[in-house]
Amino acid sequence: MEQEIIFAVDIDGVLRNTLKAMVETYNKYFDDNKTCEDVFEFKCDNVFPRIEKETGIKASEWFFQLHSEEVFEDSLPCVGALDAFKGLQKYGKVIIVSYQKTTKNKIQALKWLEKNGFPTTDVCFLKDKTLLHTDYLIDDNDWNFKNTNVKHAVLIDAPYNKNIELFDIIDSTNEDKILSISRYYSLFDFYTDYVLYGGVQ
């Protein structure tokens, strides 16, 4: 009997357009005109230094605790994400794997998934994604592929990872384990350009 393919899919930056919500929330409170393309790295404390300078609160805390409702609950889904998610379910088991900083953020993630039509039955909140032994990991954070134990790494494009070279995220500890590494503009593009054309292994 053929083993079922398992897709591990991240939430933020893959299903949920958190970046857009963060930038809009920041601009609203700081009367600024920053764009998503200005977010040059994953660590928001370095991208939004004005927050700590003017409030004394680190940007990560400001976004993910003080303004978590605007950032997490009010975020829109990434374009085509739900259709792609449902499409992947026809090819294997899809689990949602995400690191959420606080218990409140985890609850907000579950509420958001349910509100936007995603299932909440197979959700795993996990900081260390090297513990995953799935066929695919689909993520926007290149660090989650370091020392990975997945067979196929799929990096979803974002302004903060556009300068990342694909093979730079693989090191000697996992180069023999990983079968393929690729990048796509979105989960929808991965589904339409790769999965539908027989790329699933």
Residue locations for each model-derived region?
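Metal-dependent phosphoesterase signature
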Residues: 34, 45-80
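A structural signal for isolated positions on well-ordered beta-strands in alpha/beta enzyme cores
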Residues: 93-95, 136, 154
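Substrate-recognition "cap/lid" segment bordering the active-site pocket of phosphatases
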Residues: 99-147
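Short, acidic loop-to-helix structural element flanking the phosphoryl-transfer center
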Residues: 67-96, 104-107
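Acidic, Mg2+-coordinating phosphoryl-transfer loop and its flanking beta/alpha structural elements
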Residues: 138-182
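Active-site neighborhood of HAD-like aspartate-dependent phosphohydrolases
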Residues: 1-57
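Structural recognition of alpha->loop->beta junctions
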Residues: 112-126, 169-195
